[in-house]
């Protein structure tokens, strides 16, 4: 089915208690230079990952809607990935499978949609303008196309500022999972005006 011009998917409302669990700590440590060899090495180690997956909590907050879901993100190859959103009851709300030139999405009614742009599809079906193309890099702790960013005292990404399609996205990282090598983001928050997207990763599996 081709993509409609109206919203179809409605996830469960966001409980107020969930917001406090995703609150990011304020970092006061001095940052490191983006030109440092340690940062270049960390970027290269992350880019060398062929496959990875993570799961955790997702929150979207705007003036129009508040949404909470569990998410599962799996990358199986270059530009091949799967995104699954489930509600607090464990039911699937959205499943997206993407590969070069072909994106398929199944909603909570089992209806299947196809398109060639995952970011546009998510926005039209859910009403949430998630910068999915950039988020694929940001969730790994990489700046993507952004040139305005800061590092923490461990030479890892701590903040990104990026203008895209008239939106000014700010990404703040609240910590990293040092149990994985290389260390991967543990939680992060994206904001543009009154819109906020929060991700809290429970664990990572990297290869």
Swiss-Prot record:
Monomer. Keywords: Cell outer membrane, Chaperone, Lipoprotein, Membrane, Palmitate, Protein transport, Signal, Transport. The gene is lolB. It comes from the Bacteria. NCBIfam families: lolB (TIGR00548). Gene3D superfamilies: Lipoprotein localisation LolA/LolB/LppX. GO terms for cellular component: cell outer membrane. It is found in: Cell outer membrane. This is Outer-membrane lipoprotein LolB. InterPro entries: LolA/LolB/LppX, OM_lipoprot_LolB. GO terms for biological process: lipoprotein localization to outer membrane; protein transport. It holds the Pfam family LolB. Residues 1-21 form the signal peptide. Belongs to the LolB family. It comes from Salmonella arizonae (strain ATCC BAA-731 / CDC346-86 / RSK2980). A lipid is attached at residue 22 (N-palmitoyl cysteine). Plays a critical role in the incorporation of lipoproteins in the outer membrane after they are released by the LolA protein. It is a lipid-anchor. A lipid is attached at residue 22 (S-diacylglycerol cysteine).
């Amino acid at each position: 089915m081709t993509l409609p011009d109206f919203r179809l998917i409605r996830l469960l409302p966001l409980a107020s208690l969930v917001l406090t669990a995703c609150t990011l700590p304020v970092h006061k440590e001095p940052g490191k230079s983006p030109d440092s060899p340690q940062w270049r090495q960390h970027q290269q180690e992350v880019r060398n990952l062929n496959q990875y997956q993570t799961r955790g909590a997702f929150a979207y907050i705007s003036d129009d809607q508040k949404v909470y879901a569990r998410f599962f993100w799996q990358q199986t190859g270059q530009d091949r990935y799967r995104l699954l959103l489930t509600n607090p009851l464990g039911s699937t709300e959205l499943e997206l499978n993407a590969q070069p030139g072909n994106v398929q999405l199944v909603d909570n009614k089992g209806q299947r949609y196809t398109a060639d742009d995952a970011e546009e599809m998510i926005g039209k079906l859910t009403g949430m303008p998630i910068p999915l193309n950039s988020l694929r890099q940001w969730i790994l702790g990489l700046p993507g196309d952004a040139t305005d960013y800061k590092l923490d005292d461990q030479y890892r990404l701590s903040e990104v500022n990026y203008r895209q399609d008239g939106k000014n996205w700010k990404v703040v990282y609240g910590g990293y999972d040092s149990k994985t090598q290389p260390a991967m983001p543990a939680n992060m928050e994206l904001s543009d005006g009154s819109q906020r997207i929060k991700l809290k990763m429970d664990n990572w599996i990297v290869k």
